[in-house]
Amino acid sequence: MSELPRVGLGFDVHVFEPGRPCWLVGLLFPDNDGCAGHSDGDVAVHALCDAVLSAAGQGDIGGLFAVGDPRWERVSGADMLRHVVELLLRHGYEVVNASVQVIGNRPKIGPRRTEAQRLLSALLRAPVSVAATTTEGLGLTGRGEGLSAIATALVVQV
């Protein structure tokens, strides 16, 4: 009998850093400030990476892309996701599907949702759904100080 599918959960949060490029769901949003971070600050992709790693029992992005390691400084979320997928394949897993929800007031994801889903699906080699919500003025994201994202991923052993 083959191993049952495995589910992983990922979460990330970053504050905005004025003047920094805004990368979110793998896309550049040029009219918005980006998020602070060692890499590109893309909370959605980081949450996806954590969800995929968690599902396959491979730790988290903090362990894989250590902040003190200069190889990962300013690395793109797309490159991180590619690296995670390759790691998964080496360990005998593949992603079945994933979902990510961005939490924040800006930038608006809706107008670029299809573009984001296509990009993330290509990177993960599996269907990815993208959603967004706000916290109705509550907390860091509600005050417009940053963004967070939560993601799930389903993987199977191949």
Curated annotation (Swiss-Prot):
Cofactor note: Binds 1 divalent metal cation per subunit.
This protein's pathway: Isoprenoid biosynthesis; isopentenyl diphosphate biosynthesis via DXP pathway; isopentenyl diphosphate from 1-deoxy-D-xylulose 5-phosphate: step 4/6
A Pfam family of this chain: YgbB
Alphabetical list of Gene3D superfamilies matching this protein: 2-C-methyl-D-erythritol 2,4-cyclodiphosphate synthase
Ribonucleoprotein as UniProt keyword: no
Alphabetized SUPFAM superfamilies for the sequence: IpsF-like
Chain residues that bind a divalent metal cation: 12, 14, 46
PROSITE patterns assigned to the protein according to its UniProt record, in alphabetical order: ISPF
InterPro entries (UniProt xref): MECDP_synthase, MECDP_synthase_CS, MECDP_synthase_sf
Domain of life: Bacteria
GO biological process, one term: terpenoid biosynthetic process
Enzyme class: lyase
Amino-acid positions noted as binding 4-CDP-2-C-methyl-D-erythritol 2-phosphate in the UniProt annotation, renumbered to this chain: 12-14, 38-39, 60-62, 133-136, 143
Keywords in alphabetical order: Isoprene biosynthesis, Lyase, Metal-binding
Molecular function (Gene Ontology), one example: metal ion binding
Catalytic activity: 4-CDP-2-C-methyl-D-erythritol 2-phosphate = 2-C-methyl-D-erythritol 2,4-cyclic diphosphate + CMP
EC code: 4.6.1.12
Membership in a protein family: Belongs to the IspF family.
Function according to Swiss-Prot or TrEMBL: Involved in the biosynthesis of isopentenyl diphosphate (IPP) and dimethylallyl diphosphate (DMAPP), two major building blocks of isoprenoid compounds. Catalyzes the conversion of 4-diphosphocytidyl-2-C-methyl-D-erythritol 2-phosphate (CDP-ME2P) to 2-C-methyl-D-erythritol 2,4-cyclodiphosphate (ME-CPP) with a corresponding release of cytidine 5-monophosphate (CMP).
Subunit structure: Homotrimer.
Protein name: 2-C-methyl-D-erythritol 2,4-cyclodiphosphate synthase
Record organism: Mycobacterium leprae (strain TN)
Source species taxonomy: Bacteria, Bacillati, Actinomycetota, Actinomycetes, Mycobacteriales
